[in-house]
């Protein structure tokens, strides 16, 4: 199968080409077209995939609703993709919404009462549900029932509505912000981890085939190793490298073409861009390697604290360039080496010789 992209409007580049955050509607449409549809097509997340294969198979065999599923991890790792795959594997409908959209209990009630037997309800950013909406959700998850108020004032009364059995799939980048009562109602909890370069190389090769973009193994790996362990970034870089190959080359994506294209995009071999380097430079140069508080870093580089915490930091921490401590962020010796700066005596004592 191949995907024709001529029908898609030109996609403006995101603020950061290595950002794992959702981008423009046009790019999201193309991203949806590249998503795997079934578990057998899904690359990576071996532990979560094995669990889901077993639990989905059991639910399908018994013709029951799958237990409620919580997916958490950094953005861009495939939480939305997995929700679609779960519904497809179960052969049921998927209803999709997000925590901020469900402002009032009636918003959630309207969704729940329209679900058919064993359907999947996907709530992205579930940690952002309001407390009053969350209260309505509890009996729905446990007993497939909701209580709604009819009328107003003294004449108001509560009625109980029965729901069809359904599966809630909740996704969040901040599992720690979920309330304990909500977290406890998920029978299946899966943490999505960053992907290895080898896994991302398989994803890039598959996506290139769908985009009719010739690519060799070295070209795919070059894109993969700079993709920060994130499929969304890998697919975005692939599309930009494909553009470069079409204009500056013969259309084939080789290692040399990928290296030149990614250098033009200012994505270095570690997958760092200008914003990553600004953060590391701020901690190393302005704050002597730390420890430094998140708000101070945010002010010094002109970014929101939440963006730093959710989008920029996770990869730097996972790769060992930054540490979070109770006293603040600390640059590691790897960060000093990456910037070509001699570590301070304090950091040498803390981490050992460079």
Curated annotation (Swiss-Prot):
Binding site for ATP: 34-35, 76, 79-81, 142-144, 185, 195, 232
Species annotation: Paracidovorax citrulli (strain AAC00-1) (Acidovorax citrulli)
Cell compartments where the protein resides: Cytoplasm
Subunit (UniProt): Homohexamer. Forms an RuvA(8)-RuvB(12)-Holliday junction (HJ) complex. HJ DNA is sandwiched between 2 RuvA tetramers; dsDNA enters through RuvA and exits via RuvB. An RuvB hexamer assembles on each DNA strand where it exits the tetramer. Each RuvB hexamer is contacted by two RuvA subunits (via domain III) on 2 adjacent RuvB subunits; this complex drives branch migration. In the full resolvosome a probable DNA-RuvA(4)-RuvB(12)-RuvC(2) complex forms which resolves the HJ.
Name recorded for this polypeptide: Holliday junction branch migration complex subunit RuvB
Gene Ontology molecular functions: ATP binding; ATP hydrolysis activity; four-way junction DNA binding; four-way junction helicase activity
Catalytic activity: ATP + H2O = ADP + phosphate + H(+)
UniProt-annotated binding residues for Mg(2+): 80
Taxon lineage: Bacteria, Pseudomonadati, Pseudomonadota, Betaproteobacteria, Burkholderiales
Record's function text: The RuvA-RuvB-RuvC complex processes Holliday junction (HJ) DNA during genetic recombination and DNA repair, while the RuvA-RuvB complex plays an important role in the rescue of blocked DNA replication forks via replication fork reversal (RFR). RuvA specifically binds to HJ cruciform DNA, conferring on it an open structure. The RuvB hexamer acts as an ATP-dependent pump, pulling dsDNA into and through the RuvAB complex. RuvB forms 2 homohexamers on either side of HJ DNA bound by 1 or 2 RuvA tetramers; 4 subunits per hexamer contact DNA at a time.
Residue span of region Large ATPase domain (RuvB-L): 5-195
PANTHER family (alphabetical): HOLLIDAY JUNCTION BRANCH MIGRATION COMPLEX SUBUNIT RUVB, PTHR42848
Gene Ontology CC entries for this record: cytoplasm; Holliday junction resolvase complex
């Amino acid at each position: 199968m191949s995907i024709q992209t001529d029908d898609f409007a030109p996609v403006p580049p995101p603020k950061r080409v290595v950002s794992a955050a959702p981008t423009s509607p046009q790019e999201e449409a193309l991203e949806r077209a590249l998503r795997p549809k079934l578990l057998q097509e899904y690359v990576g997340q071996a532990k979560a995939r094995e669990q889901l294969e077993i639990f989905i198979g059991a639910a399908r065999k018994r013709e029951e609703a799958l237990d409620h599923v919580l997916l958490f991890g950094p953005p861009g790792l495939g939480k939305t993709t997995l929700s679609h795959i779960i519904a497809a594997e179960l052969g049921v409908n998927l209803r999709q919404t997000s925590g901020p959209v469900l402002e009032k209990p009636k918003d959630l009630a309207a969704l729940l009462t329209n679900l058919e037997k064993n359907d999947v309800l996907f709530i992205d950013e579930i940690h952002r549900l309001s407390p009053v909406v969350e209260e309505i959700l509890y009996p729905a998850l446990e007993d497939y029932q909701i209580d709604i108020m009819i009328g107003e004032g003294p004449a108001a009364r509560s009625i109980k509505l029965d729901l069809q059995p359904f599966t809630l799939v909740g996704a969040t980048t901040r599992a720690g912000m979920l309330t304990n009562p909500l977290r406890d109602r998920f029978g299946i909890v899966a943490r999505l981890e960053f992907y290895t370069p080898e896994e991302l190389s398989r994803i890039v090769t598959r996506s290139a085939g769908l985009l009719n973009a010739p690519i060799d193994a070295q070209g795919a790996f070059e894109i993969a190793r700079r993709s920060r362990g994130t499929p969304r970034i890998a697919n975005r870089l692939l599309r930009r490298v494909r553009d470069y190959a079409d204009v500056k080359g013969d259309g084939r994506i080789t290692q040399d073409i990928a290296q030149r294209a990614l250098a033009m995009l200012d994505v270095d071999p570690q997958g760092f861009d200008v914003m990553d380097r600004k953060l590391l430079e701020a901690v190393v140069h302005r704050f002597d390697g730390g420890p430094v508080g998140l708000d101070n870093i945010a002010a010094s580089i002109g970014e929101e604290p939440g963006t730093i915490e959710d989008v920029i930091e996770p990869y730097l921490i996972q790769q060992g360039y930054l540490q979070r401590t109770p006293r603040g962020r600390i640059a590691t010796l790897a960060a000093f080496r990456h910037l070509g700066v001699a570590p301070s005596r304090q950091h040498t004592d803390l981490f050992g010789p460079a």
